Amino acid sequence: MEGHIHHITPRNITASILQQKVAVQGIITKSSQIRPLLQTAVQFCPLDYSTHARDLSHADVMVKLSSKTPDGKPLELEPGLSTYKDFQTLVVQEMPESAPTGQMPRSVIVILLDQLVDKGKPGDRVIINGTLKALAGPNHSSTFKVVLEAENINTLQSEGPELTEIDKENIKKVMKEENPINLLSKSIAPSIYGHSDVKKAILLMLVGATPKIRLRSRVRGDIHVMLCGDPSTAKSQLLRYVMSIAPLAVSTNGRGATGVGLTAAVVNDPDTNQRTLEAGAMVLADRGIVCVDEFDKMSIEDRAAMHEVMEQQTVTVQKAGIHTALNARCSILAAANPSNGNYDVKKSPMENLYFPESLLSRFDLIFIILDSSTEELDRRLSQHVLKMHRHFDALTEQRGDDEVNVLALVDAEREKIGDAPVYQDTSLYEGEKLFTNKFIKKYVTYARNLPTPSLSESASETIADAYVKLRENERLKRIKHNFKIKTLPITARALDSLIRLAEAHARIRGSDTIDEIDAQVAVQLIFYAHFDENWEGNITTDIARKVREYLTNELIAECKDVIQFDDILSICGIDKPTLMKILPQLSFGYDEDEEFVYKQN
């Protein structure tokens, strides 16, 4: 096509551009079945036995046939003598990440003819060239319906913002740093105190790995992460932050989400009364991230609908005569609260969440986030929050004619193309350089598009040793706790998780090989998520907190004289060497020979 073409989204469609050539960018949310459309209509008059042929190849697709001749004689359609062409309708909606906050995404009906039918399916991101036309509404209403008569369809292959040469140079400089994941993770939700390992996992999830074909079976490359724990531990805030830095993200809430709303639904088209296929959130987020808050509020049946998406990354539809499979190649970031309010460390994650093991094993990482309380930690947290309030940027919302939606402005900023500023201009974190959200988004986009790194021999050995140790740790804990394990299940999927995490870290470094350092980062996150310790057996603050809380409750609240080592090891799920590393840090006395702990005067 030649001449000026308006490049628009469904939100920009107005009466001023009707009957003009446009290029509409959006995502296909609904597709109809293919039906025949009259191309040459042959009509028969039963009074004089005459036939009348009418060429409709250049007429509007919704034109109505006349039922009478010019002199008033009746006409009947002869279907056998008429000719037809293929006809299909799509609904194209503006991109979820570009819709202004607080407003419904807008859509436009697209008409496909002949060779264009079946060129797009729900979930595809497309640019459709065609002509905007107005169709009369029912009952000769003065309002019209806008449709786009397609002339060409291009499927978008790349996601994320456009990178300039300066952006690429800045990204390569960061990749050459000694430990880029530490630099980047500090810039992820900097207003949230702590959770360094969780932020690293989120960064690895955003970058992801490459799906692979292994013995004719597809192995996913997307990383799934769940955040579970006590209320007020910033789980939802982390999800909201991911929405702002992910190149493509769709948000949903478990309280109102249904299985078909997350996957796909077969609905009736009100105009044609035909069955149409409508894409759900996971199909719309193909090659992106799905953030599911209140994951524990979903029903068992709705959560079961996610099993296929999380492992096979497709949505199979077998309803109302429609048999198809839609792509849902997305990562899942879920946040859940324990069923009893606060997380009970004496119970397993399955008992705390009432989730089946088949679902939990599909997550690569499940972080148990507890509301830890020590005097030092509380003081640091309060200082961090107070510093934020002293240095916050005031956002003024004006009402009336000049009303400004601050969040909508933030979303609109995503669409701007240009050099991204590298560092934030803030006085909140003195002495630290934090990357801007725009730069992190471009960094993630660049890393995702790098060639697939190859697995080195040293990394393979590290991953294999770690997997064996994971299984051994789980077996020992099952025996120690009479097969009532307090940690997450270790299945063969954990081995694939280690490989995916290591590959994502290699992409962050810009390396063409997965080295031992990448494997060590992956192993560290897996061990921290499963056992609250690193793979070398070092003690984490959460383990020490568990022991401190148990001893405080038994010796002070329950007024017991002594606590035997065996009771501590059984309740806290640790071994004696670990306990002996923790006890010197606590304000309790202990006798290593007699193996008991007592309250000091």
UniProtKB/Swiss-Prot annotation:
It is found in: Nucleus; Chromosome; Nucleus, Nucleoplasm. The keyword Nucleus applies. A motif (Arginine finger) lies at residues 361-364. Pfam families: MCM (PF00493), MCM_lid (PF17855), MCM_OB (PF17207). Its main location: nucleus. One of its GO terms (cellular component) is nucleus. One of its GO terms (biological process) is mitotic DNA replication initiation. InterPro entries: AAA+_ATPase, MCM, Mcm3, MCM_CS, MCM_dom, MCM_lid, MCM_OB, NA-bd_OB-fold. Residues 180-386 form the MCM domain. ATP binds at residues 229-236. It catalyses: ATP + H2O = ADP + phosphate + H(+). One of its GO terms (molecular function) is ATP binding. It is an enzyme of class 3 (hydrolase). Its EC number is 3.6.4.12. Gene3D superfamilies: 2.20.28.10, Nucleic acid-binding proteins (2.40.50.140), P-loop containing nucleotide triphosphate hydrolases (3.40.50.300). PROSITE patterns: MCM_1 (PS00847), MCM_2 (PS50051). Keywords: ATP-binding, Cell cycle, Chromosome, DNA replication, DNA-binding, Helicase, Hydrolase, Nucleotide-binding, Nucleus. Component of the MCM2-7 complex. PANTHER family: DNA REPLICATION LICENSING FACTOR MCM FAMILY MEMBER (PTHR11630), DNA REPLICATION LICENSING FACTOR MCM3-RELATED (PTHR11630:SF46). Belongs to the MCM family. Acts as a component of the MCM2-7 complex (MCM complex) which is the replicative helicase essential for DNA replication initiation and elongation in eukaryotic cells. Required for DNA replication and cell proliferation. The active ATPase sites in the MCM2-7 ring are formed through the interaction surfaces of two neighboring subunits such that a critical structure of a conserved arginine finger motif is provided in trans relative to the ATP-binding site of the Walker A box of the adjacent subunit. This is DNA replication licensing factor MCM3. The gene is MCM3.
